[in-house]
Amino acid sequence: MAPDGAPVDETGTLVHESGGFLLKRDRGGTFTLDLRRTPVDLVEKRVRITGWETRPGHVDVEGIQKYRY
């Protein structure tokens, strides 16, 4: 069963800020990310995330990986 909210499949730059993580989206804007693990090896790198937008601007991340153009 899928979580409540809209599915998300986005690319951008992973940023560590204020004790949490943000995705600076390639399409503009940001998402605040709820992550199950701390992806220190991906900070300040381009990534692709998948998950669910649980409330406006907040994503429960199911997957995160390094992304190339």
Listing of model-derived features with the role each one plays in the protein:
Residues M1-Y69:
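OB-fold and OB-like single-stranded nucleic-acid-recognition modules
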